[in-house]
């Protein structure tokens, strides 16, 4: 039986703010787009924190639903992954790819003194 009064000390916004990394990626461990987003960030040498919403404490149904609902309110999307640079939503994997191509990713990362590898800067 699930306790509907269950309250985690952390919301999605708190998880982002408390991250030691400038980039936070909300993910599902089995999701191919989530895996692709992780690979893209690794290839770009971007430090990031992954919050897997289907593992550990985040599997608890009430907490999971609350975090997913909050992410949807923050981003306007109910899909994963969701990438944040600082507190700014970049979006999902295809949005992150587009941000790389149009220079938005570079601009957001520069605020954290992160430089993309040569040849990928726009």
Q: Over which residues does each language-model region extend?
A:
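Thiol/disulfide oxidoreductase modules built on the thioredoxin-like
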Residues: 71-79
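N-terminal organelle transit peptides
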Residues: 1-9, 122
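Non-catalytic, surface beta->alpha helical segment in thiol-disulfide oxidoreductase systems
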Residues: 85-120
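Alpha-helical interaction elements in eukaryotic regulators
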Residues: 8, 30-33, 37, 63, ...
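Eukaryote-biased feature marking scaffold/signaling PDZ-domain proteins and nuclear chromatin regulators
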Residues: 18-21, 26, 62, 66, ...
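Local sequence-structure signature of Cys/Sec-based thiol-disulfide redox active-site neighborhoods
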Residues: 7-53
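Thiol-based oxidoreductase modules, predominantly thioredoxin-like and allied folds used
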Residues: 47-68
């Amino acid at each position: 039986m699930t306790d509907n009064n269950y309250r985690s000390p952390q919301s999605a916004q708190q998880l982002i703010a408390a991250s030691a990394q400038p980039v936070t990626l909300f993910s599902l461990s089995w999701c191919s787009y989530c895996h692709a987003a992780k690979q893209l960030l690794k290839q770009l040498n971007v430090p990031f924190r992954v919050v897997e919403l289907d593992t550990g404490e985040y599997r608890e149904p009430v907490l999971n639903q609350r975090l997913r609902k909050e992410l949807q309110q923050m981003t306007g999307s109910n899909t994963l992954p969701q990438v944040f640079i600082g507190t700014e939503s970049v979006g999902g994997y295809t949005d992150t790819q587009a941000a790389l191509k149009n220079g938005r990713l570079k601009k957001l990362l520069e605020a954290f003194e992160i430089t993309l590898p040569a040849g990928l800067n726009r």
